């Protein structure tokens, strides 16, 4: 619909049911709606063929529930426009083993979208943002107010449009958006303790290989935006113990025995 400049019409709601303005199948779950569509087509003699097939669907990694992708407003950090800088940062770090740098490089080179840092969860670090109830303009907390939870603390003031009512941001930060700040947090802690020597880049980061694309990558991104060329001089990448060949130990799978 974007290519054709058509307005977005939401069919599936966040609760997994069909929107009220969709004829015939409103209020049904996605699975029930599929069955009802087939029934209606068959009833009107419009169904040419129906057969079972096997195909790939997206599922939740732990419980296996089918996942439906729903477009929504989210917060992003720009990474697509700084790919060259991120590649240079990766080259400036010593990787152990050296082959692991290839994973980082391949991830950066093949990025197709920016970093989504917002999540619809209960627990997490809140965004200090309120939206004008009339025009939707975001209003940010002053640095002196931080930390602040907009769900608990109302915004005082008026929007440029004259409205004085505001809606708090309910999303929270992705866990990588905070864990990627470890060098900055350590530096600030050291400064608070009176340590004046250069603290970043730190000496070494140790981590497992499967989070090169997350923890290592996002820490390098944050370090770039916080005016540090690299977060650490060396990064040591390790593996992890498998429950059986090709399967990692997982609490949800109960295979840790």
Region locations from a protein language model:
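Residue patterns forming the tRNA-binding/recognition surfaces of aminoacyl-tRNA synthetases
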Residues: 2-135, 215, 247, 257
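Conserved active-site neighborhood of enzyme catalytic/cofactor-binding cores
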Residues: 9-10, 16, 107-114, 118-257
């Amino acid at each position: 619909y974007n290519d054709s400049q058509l307005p977005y019409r939401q069919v599936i709601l966040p609760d997994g049911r069909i929107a009220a303005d969709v004829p015939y199948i409103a209020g049904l779950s996605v699975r029930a709606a599929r069955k009802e569509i087939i029934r209606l087509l068959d009833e009107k003699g419009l169904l040419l063929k129906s057969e079972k097939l096997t195909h790939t669907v997206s599922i939740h990694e732990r419980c296996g529930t089918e996942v439906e992708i729903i477009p929504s407003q989210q917060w992003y950090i720009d990474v697509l426009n700084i790919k060259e800088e991120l590649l240079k940062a990766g080259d400036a770090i010593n990787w152990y083993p050296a082959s692991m740098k290839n994973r980082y490089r391949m991830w950066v080179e093949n990025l197709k979208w920016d970093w989504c840092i917002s999540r619809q969860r209960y627990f997490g670090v809140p965004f200090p943002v309120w939206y004008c109830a009339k025009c939707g303009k975001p209003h940010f907390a002053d640095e002196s107010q931080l930390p602040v939870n907009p769900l608990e603390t109302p915004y005082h003031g008026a929007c440029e449009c004259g409205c004085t009512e505001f809606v708090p941001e309910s999303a929270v930060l992705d866990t990588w958006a905070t864990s990627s700040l470890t060098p900055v947090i350590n530096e600030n802690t050291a400064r608070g303790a009176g340590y004046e020597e250069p603290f970043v880049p730190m000496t070494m980061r140790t981590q497992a290989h499967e989070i090169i694309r997350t923890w290592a990558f996002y820490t390098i991104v944050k370090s770039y935006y916080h005016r540090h060329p690299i977060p650490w001089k060396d990064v040591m990448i390790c593996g992890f113990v498998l429950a059986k060949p090709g399967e990692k130990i997982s609490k949800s799978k109960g295979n840790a025995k």
